[in-house]
Amino acid sequence: MSERIAEVSRDTLETQIRVRINLDGQGKGQFDTGLPFLDHMLDQVARHGVVDLEIVAKGDLHIDAHHTVEDIGITLGQAMARALGDKKGIRRYGHAYVPLDEALSRVVVDFSGRPGLEYHVDYPRARIGDFDVDLFGEFFQGFVNHAAVTLHIDNLRGRNAHHVAETIFKAFGRALRMAAEPDPRMQGTTPSTKGSL
């Protein structure tokens, strides 16, 4: 399998985003989004997905964080799709349950080529620090649309909003890792009866 590395830049009048991902990395992350709590969540994806991930973002945070968070999701999705290439030889499906104290979340992903998000999370409060938790849904929608994956995210329980978010992002990383992992029994084969994804 060739190197699974991609770098994508996205520049609009609202944001400038750069993402670099190595799917066969060591879990190293570098983040500068202007949103410290989002940086913390993205670091969970790198570490638990065991991917090397660099994200630099400049956005219109003087308005709010919506454009920046959504566009990071979009650009990460584009980078993921590019790094995966034709998806031959991967496992395709991934899932993870992750607990953190009282919180428990489940994430299931399918590198199907069909964008779809089922996001079922009721945060116990609207903000974590100064971060608007509604924006996590925008992040995942942007990712799904541009990675062309089906993604199910369910928070099963949790009273602490920080714990809820962290379990989601850790499970997201672990599910991505499982789905993108090379399957030695599928070398050179697309994991679909259609012959393409």
From Swiss-Prot:
Protein name in UniProt: Imidazoleglycerol-phosphate dehydratase
Any one GO cellular component localisation term in the record: cytoplasm
MF annotations from Gene Ontology: imidazoleglycerol-phosphate dehydratase activity
Gene Ontology biological process terms, A to Z: L-histidine biosynthetic process
Organism: Thioalkalivibrio sulfidiphilus (strain HL-EbGR7)
Keywords on record: Amino-acid biosynthesis, Cytoplasm, Histidine biosynthesis, Lyase
The keyword Disulfide bond is annotated on this UniProt entry: no
Catalytic activity: D-erythro-1-(imidazol-4-yl)glycerol 3-phosphate = 3-(imidazol-4-yl)-2-oxopropyl phosphate + H2O
InterPro entries: IGPD_sf, ImidazoleglycerolP_deHydtase, ImidazoleglycerP_deHydtase_CS, Ribosomal_Su5_D2-typ_SF
Chief localisation class: cytoplasm
EC number from the UniProt entry: 4.2.1.19
PROSITE patterns registered for this protein in UniProt: IGP_DEHYDRATASE_1 (PS00954), IGP_DEHYDRATASE_2 (PS00955)
Pathway info: Amino-acid biosynthesis; L-histidine biosynthesis; L-histidine from 5-phospho-alpha-D-ribose 1-diphosphate: step 6/9
Subcellular location per the Swiss-Prot or TrEMBL entry: Cytoplasm
Protein family according to the UniProt entry: Belongs to the imidazoleglycerol-phosphate dehydratase family.
